[in-house]
């Protein structure tokens, strides 16, 4: 096994770990949503904090889940065309799309850092009374999520390149 393959495998193990944690966030989100519905319709009461917790849980699910989805090939692909390509062309497309994903990740990380730092500097919280006060923590997940997406895209690029090179 080459060092590049070991790196790609190590990234996969890490992303799978993150994916398992993200799955538990999904379970927590389902519980919170169920409790909110029960409180609202069963007891005619609600909690702003619990409502905000729903999207505080949804954000890491989306931001961390996109790397897990990429790892397991669950991202969107135009299979009508892709299915007819040779394996070598599929690998080439994999390399190109991984590089594009990495570039987009770098752009999002770069653009979000000042946004996150500003949020931390002002101690940004919710405008809703009784809501979750530490919104800056949630915003910090944006560059983290795209960093995870970057490293998983790197693993995909490595694998596609090695397959493309060996098929040539």
Residue ranges and their predicted role:
Residues 1-168:
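Alpha-helical transmembrane segments and membrane-interface helix-loop junctions
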């Amino acid at each position: 096994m080459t060092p590049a393959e070991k790196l790609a495998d190590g990234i996969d193990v890490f992303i799978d770990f993150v994916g398992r944690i993200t799955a538990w966030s999904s379970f927590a989100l389902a519980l919170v949503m169920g409790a909110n519905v029960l409180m609202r319709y069963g007891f005619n009461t609600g909690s702003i904090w619990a409502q905000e917790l729903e999207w505080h849980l949804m954000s890491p699910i989306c931001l961390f889940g996109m790397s897990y989805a990429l790892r397991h090939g669950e991202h969107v692909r135009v299979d009508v065309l892709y299915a007819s390509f040779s394996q070598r062309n599929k690998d080439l497309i994999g390399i190109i799309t991984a590089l594009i994903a990495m570039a987009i990740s770098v752009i999002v990380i770069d653009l979000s850092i000042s946004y996150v730092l500003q949020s931390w500097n002002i101690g940004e919280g919710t405008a809703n009374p009784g809501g979750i006060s530490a919104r800056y923590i949630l915003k910090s997940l944006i560059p983290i999520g795209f960093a995870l997406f970057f490293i998983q895209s790197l693993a995909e690029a490595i694998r596609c390149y090695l397959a493309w090179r060996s098929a040539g």
